[in-house]
């Protein structure tokens, strides 16, 4: 729901690569999705011949020349290089780069090809003052052939390289280098685990505008090595001091395979959008636009998988939709949360998925839609209500008949925020997130609000928005670090998209490391065959 501050270790879970945590494929759906993904692979936002990078070349004149390529269909970068090393006073390596000014985030999954000759071959992400000098100041996040991960840097031209080793991240597969003003932060993890962090500050010889990109060095002048970079995300973060719900940056629509963690960007826009819902036939995703001009902002859009084009959905007078919109299980209806009336307070309406005249369901506001029951008779939502004798809204979970009849029924009343309710596909449970323990964690209860049980017990993360796989065996959640206040889920933060069994029998594992948060995955977004999840990440224009 809308933020209340305004208006509103890889653990095995019996899920092996190639298996499907989602159960039975709906008739006709698998073919639609297979064709769709083959089409979507070519839908990357990276427009140039080298994707998000502007050029490539060898630094330091290595004996064996290298190259960099970008495969737009698979969204994969491949680098091949020789080079003595990136160390001491001389660097020799292949570099795919772009010039960037100010803060940035570059994330990549790194895969060396073959066993390699030297255990210290290295690849990763770098920011560098000069591409002409072999002894330039730089900072990099380096993955070595023997699994060593280190934050390496040269403070001044001609000086020796220094490094901070990260033993806890040994054999990492995901590297992320970030600049925050004068601070450089390296995050590294084996896919599935949370990041380990190292950082270095005060490197004045790495200027505000510098060369940023991917690198490879073979660590042997007579050998050429090759590395593949997958899931590369070049991100321009939001400016320091931005005002939430007024200042926005662009959005990327991504789809991740929940078994392998393989993810693709299928659409990107400078006009921000949020919260994708997947149609049951797999043909399209629905989302709301949160920015842009009045003809876009607050409107619902249908993103066609085959054409990769969004079209406007007619929602009548309801043209101030927020990111709490949910399809019925059969896909025939959509319940929206709109702020066009009632003094801009969020109100729940239903209408046909194809568009039409909204029917008001909740007489009381604010109300934020989150779940249908499988029989489409009830809506489950978060409501802000002023308790007897109180002055401020308390946010609890309610249900109301989907035809608008009768009074709403209050299901929770514990101190703190209860939010994000979603009904299991068998109709027996409501999963939700709550701060009743002091942190934001996942809980569940019966449809009558009884038999409340805790699902997650994370002491390092605040967990939000449980979403069920179609067979009800899995949930995805989005997790914030403890630096974020538990009852808040802000925009433009480092988050993790995680998956776990619905019964809590195994710990969550990471399937995507995201720069996003609010609007990333507020509503159900599993593919109908249970193999993929759609979500939104964010970046300003590069």
Which role does the model predict for each range below?
Residues 7, 16-18, 42:
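Low-complexity, intrinsically disordered segments with a bias for serine/threonine
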Residues 3, 12-14:
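Serine residues within intrinsically disordered or low-complexity segments
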Residues 44-243:
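Extracellular glycan-recognition regions
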Residues 2, 26-27:
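N-terminal hydrophobic targeting signals that begin at the initiator methionine
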Residues 8-10, 34:
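Compositionally biased, low-complexity segments
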Residues 14-25:
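Short, Lys/Arg-enriched N-terminal segments with co-localized hydrophobic residues
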């Amino acid at each position: 729901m809308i933020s209340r501050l305004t208006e509103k270790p890889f653990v095995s879970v019996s899920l092996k690569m190639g298996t499907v945590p989602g159960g039975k494929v709906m008739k006709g759906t698998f073919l639609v999705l297979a064709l769709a993904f083959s089409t979507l692979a070519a839908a990357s936002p990276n427009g140039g011949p080298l994707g998000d990078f502007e050029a490539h070349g060898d630094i330091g004149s290595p004996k064996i020349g290298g190259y960099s390529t970008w495969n737009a269909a698979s969204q994969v970068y491949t680098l091949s290089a020789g080079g003595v090393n990136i160390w001491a006073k001389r660097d020799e390596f292949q570099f795919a780069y772009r010039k960037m000014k100010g803060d940035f985030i570059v994330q990549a999954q790194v895969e060396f090809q073959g066993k390699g000759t030297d255990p210290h071959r290295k690849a990763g992400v770098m920011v560098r003052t000069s591409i002409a000098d072999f002894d330039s100041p730089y900072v990099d996040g380096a993955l070595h052939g023997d699994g060593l991960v280190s934050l390496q840097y040269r403070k001044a031209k001609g000086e020796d390289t220094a490094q901070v080793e990260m033993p806890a991240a040994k054999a990492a597969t995901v590297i992320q280098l970030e600049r925050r003003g004068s601070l450089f932060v390296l995050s590294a993890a084996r896919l599935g685990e949370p990041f380990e962090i190292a950082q270095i500050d005060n490197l004045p010889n790495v200027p505000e505008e510098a060369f940023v990109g991917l690198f490879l060095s073979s660590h042997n002048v007579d050998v050429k090595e090759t590395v593949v970079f997958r899931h590369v995300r070049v991100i321009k973060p939001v400016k320091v001091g931005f005002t939430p719900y007024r200042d926005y940056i662009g959005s990327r629509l991504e789809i991740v395979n929940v078994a392998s963690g393989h993810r693709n960007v299928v659409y990107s826009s400078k006009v921000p959008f949020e919260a994708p819902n997947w149609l049951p036939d797999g043909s399209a995703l629905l989302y709301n636009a949160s920015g842009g001009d009045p003809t876009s902002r607050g409107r619902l859009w249908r993103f066609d998988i085959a054409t990769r084009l969004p079209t406007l959905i007619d929602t009548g007078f309801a043209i101030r939709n927020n990111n709490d919109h949910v399809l019925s299980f059969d896909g025939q209806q959509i319940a929206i949360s709109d702020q066009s009336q009632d003094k801009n307070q969020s109100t729940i309406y239903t209408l046909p998925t194809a568009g039409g005249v909204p029917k008001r369901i909740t007489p009381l506001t604010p109300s934020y839609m989150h779940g249908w029951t499988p029989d489409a008779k009830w809506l489950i939502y978060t409501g802000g209500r002023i308790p007897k004798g109180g002055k401020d809204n308390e946010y609890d979970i309610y249900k109301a008949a989907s035809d608008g009849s009768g009074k709403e029924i209050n299901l929770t009343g514990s101190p703190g925020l209860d939010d994000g309710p979603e009904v299991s596909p068998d109709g027996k449970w409501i999963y939700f997130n709550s701060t009743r323990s002091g942190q934001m964690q996942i809980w569940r209860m019966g449809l009558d609000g009884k038999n409340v049980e805790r699902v997650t017990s994370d002491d390092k993360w605040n967990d939000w928005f449980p979403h069920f796989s179609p067979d009800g065996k899995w949930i995805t959640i989005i997790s914030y670090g403890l630096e974020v206040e538990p009852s808040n889920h802000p925009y433009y933060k480092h988050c993790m998209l995680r998956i776990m069994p619905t019964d809590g029998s195994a710990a969550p594992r990471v399937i995507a490391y995201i720069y996003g948060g609010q609007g990333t995955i507020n509503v159900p977004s599993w593919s109908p065959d249970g193999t993929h999840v759609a979500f939104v990440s964010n970046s300003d224009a590069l």
